[in-house]
Swiss-Prot record:
Residues 133-155 are annotated as: Disordered. It comes from Gallus gallus (Chicken). CDD domains: PAX (cd00131). Pfam families: PAX. It comes from the Eukaryota. One of its GO terms (biological process) is skeletal system development. Residues 3-129 bind DNA. This is Paired box protein Pax-1. It is found in: Nucleus. InterPro entries: Homeodomain-like_sf, PAIRED_DNA-bd_dom, Paired_dom, PAX_fam, WH-like_DNA-bd_sf.
Length: 203
């Protein structure tokens, strides 16, 4: 049987509905890692710009160049074995970077260049699955807010629980000897803010 291919605008041949060959997919990723822009990769390999962008986006998300299964589930790149090795690397060296973990996975033969997780995937694993183990109080332990601070005596809720500064009774309190005021202030820190402030003003 003949495979009928179509020619895109760049002169490249493709089969509609079928994924791009893995050799070309790998070449796209390699060129991108060399710093070549997707539009230049597109022209060089005669692959549409949308296809190049899609393959690179998938690689950045999953770390895999392999196409998704047609009509099936996507292959899991972060298998339990990979997660275990990432956890071991992190526990052995808490300061290790995600890209260093990626290099270790390749060097130790845990993954090959076709299925090694991307740096962003490793970072997500560290954050979601290992963060609570490796950094219990670190930046990955998010979501916990510090306990609220107690309201200050001058909070509007406690502004003038007793006679206000314009009330003659407050003026009378301010005219009293200042001796009992500190004691009252210490004993009832939220009950005498206005009397204390009036005493300070009147000397």
């Amino acid at each position: 049987e003949h495979t009928y291919g179509e020619v895109n605008q760049l002169g490249g041949v493709f089969v509609n509905g079928r994924p791009l060959p893995n050799a070309i997919r790998l070449r796209i990723v390699e060129l991108a890692q060399l710093g070549i822009r997707p539009c230049d990769i597109s022209r060089q390999l005669r692959v549409s710009h949308g296809c190049v962008s899609k393959i690179l986006a998938r690689y950045n998300e999953t770390g895999s160049i392999l196409p998704g299964a047609i009509g099936g589930s996507k292959p899991r790149v972060t298998t339990p074995n990979v997660v275990k090795h990432i956890r071991d690397y992190k526990q052995g060296d808490p300061g290790i970077f995600a890209w260093e973990i990626r290099d270790r996975l390749l060097a130790d033969g845990v993954c090959d260049k076709y299925n090694v997780p991307s740096v962003s995937s490793i970072s997500r694993i560290l954050r979601n699955k290992i963060g609570s183990l490796s950094q219990p109080g670190g930046p990955y332990d998010g979501g916990k807010q510090p306990p609220p601070q107690p309201a200050l005596p001058y909070n509007p809720l406690y502004q003038y629980p007793y006679p206000g500064p314009m009330d003659p009774r407050a003026a009378k309190m301010g005219a009293d000897p200042p001796g009992p005021v500190p004691a009252a202030h210490v004993g009832l820190p939220r009950s005498w803010p206005s009397a204390h402030s009036v005493t300070n003003i009147l000397g």
